């Protein structure tokens, strides 16, 4: 980044010490594009140098101090301008003075806490970044560099299957089963649908993966539903006693781990939505929440002991509080 002042300009660059060996991860930007960023985990040290290059070697650059910050920040799009920082670390690199030649300043943030996963959604963005600042009397010179953080989880201690009978009284009665209630992002959802009673003409059946993003609190709560995937289970009329298998691979979809009440600002939850459509185009559905989590690769040698300990653990199974709507399949056989 260049700053043009009274005869002098400076280019600021942030360089990581392990840039050549550190893995990069794709991450969606605010405009929907995907870019690659350096990947970090909770507890890892962030170190490098801030390089200053003077454009005019015969002129000096006066400043009021130079610093580097590591920041974790949440931005709600409906409240732009108010950035909620949950991590804020500062290192002073130079006291007020002047720079007469290009030079570099080393920095290190040791075992940095990075409690949440990087996330860019419909109404919220959670980002981590380094920010170098040269303080000036008129305008500061600022350079930022974003990084991506992934939160790794251990295998859930409790991971029971989901099994439920649903239907419409005297019309439709089915039993569905999913092999687990918690899936890692590259997992396979295995299950089956069993038709106990069929007295309406079903022509189509599918499972949708729905991401529900909730932002804000109190009266300023916003819900955003996004259908991530549609998986056709059946095309045609089922008969009583028929069993239809389900095998849905998650690796091909853009999914994040489930995020609950992140810094009391937002949540991201996932649901499997079983949808049936009859010949009169009426839709019947049943939603079931599932937990998604990020499975670590083979433990990396470069991953610190603190980062391994900091891997998240799941609590017990969470049940879905449901809202009755027309067309929703009931689990107590009552007519909707």
UniProtKB/Swiss-Prot annotation:
Its signal peptide is none
Q: How does it sit in the membrane?
A: Peripheral membrane protein
Keywords of the record, alphabetical order, are:
Cytoplasm, Endosome, Membrane, Phosphoprotein, Protein transport, Transport
Give the GO cellular component terms, alphabetically.
cytosol; early endosome; glutamatergic synapse; late endosome; phagocytic vesicle; postsynaptic early endosome; postsynaptic recycling endosome; retromer complex
Q: Which Gene3D superfamilies match?
A: 2.60.40.640
Where would you find this protein in the cell? Cytoplasm; Membrane; Early endosome; Late endosome
* Record's subunit section: Component of the heterotrimeric retromer cargo-selective complex (CSC), also described as vacuolar protein sorting subcomplex (VPS), formed by VPS26 (VPS26A or VPS26B), VPS29 and VPS35. The CSC has a highly elongated structure with VPS26 and VPS29 binding independently at opposite distal ends of VPS35 as central platform. The CSC is believed to associate with variable sorting nexins to form functionally distinct retromer complex variants.
* Functional summary from the UniProt entry: Acts as a component of the retromer cargo-selective complex (CSC). The CSC is believed to be the core functional component of retromer or respective retromer complex variants acting to prevent missorting of selected transmembrane cargo proteins into the lysosomal degradation pathway. The recruitment of the CSC to the endosomal membrane involves RAB7A and SNX3. The SNX-BAR retromer mediates retrograde transport of cargo proteins from endosomes to the trans-Golgi network (TGN) and is involved in endosome-to-plasma membrane transport for cargo protein recycling.
**UniProt name for this protein:** Vacuolar protein sorting-associated protein 26B
Q: Which gene is this protein's source?
A: Vps26b
């Amino acid at each position: 980044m260049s700053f043009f002042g009274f005869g002098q300009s400076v280019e600021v660059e942030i360089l990581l010490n392990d840039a050549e060996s550190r893995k990069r991860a794709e991450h969606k930007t605010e405009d929907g594009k995907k870019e690659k960023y350096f990947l970090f985990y909770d507890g890892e040290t962030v170190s490098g140098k801030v390089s200053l290059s003077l454009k005019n070697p015969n002129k000096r650059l006066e400043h009021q101090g130079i610093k580097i910050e590591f920041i974790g920040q949440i931005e709600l799009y409906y409240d732009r301008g108010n950035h909620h920082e949950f991590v804020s670390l500062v290192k002073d690199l130079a006291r007020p003075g002047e720079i007469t030649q290009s030079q570099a300043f080393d920095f290190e943030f040791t075992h940095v806490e990075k409690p949440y996963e990087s996330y860019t959604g419909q109404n919220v963005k959670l980002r981590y970044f380094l920010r170098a600042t040269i303080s000036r009397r008129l305008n500061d010179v600022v350079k930022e560099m974003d990084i991506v953080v992934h939160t790794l989880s251990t295998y859930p201690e409790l991971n029971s299957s989901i099994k439920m009978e649903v239907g419409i009284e005297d019309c439709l009665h089915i039993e569905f089963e999913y092999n687990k209630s918690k899936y890692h992002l590259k997992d396979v959802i295995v299950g089956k649908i069993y038709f106990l009673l069929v007295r309406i003409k079903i022509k189509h059946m599918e499972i949708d993966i729905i991401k529900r993003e909730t932002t804000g609190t109190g009266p300023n709560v916003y819900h955003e539903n996004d259908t991530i995937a549609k998986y056709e289970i059946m095309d045609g009329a089922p008969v009583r006693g028929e069993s239809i298998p389900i095998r849905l691979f998650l690796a091909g979809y853009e999914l994040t781990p489930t995020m609950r009440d992140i810094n009391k600002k937002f949540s991201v939850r996932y649901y499997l939505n079983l949808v049936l459509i009859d010949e009169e185009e009426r839709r019947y559905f049943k939603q079931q929440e599932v937990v998604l989590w990020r499975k670590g690769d083979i433990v990396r040698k470069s991953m610190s002991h603190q980062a391994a300990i900091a891997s998240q653990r799941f609590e017990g199974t969470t049940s879905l509080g449901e809202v009755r709507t027309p067309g929703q399949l009931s689990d107590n056989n009552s007519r909707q």
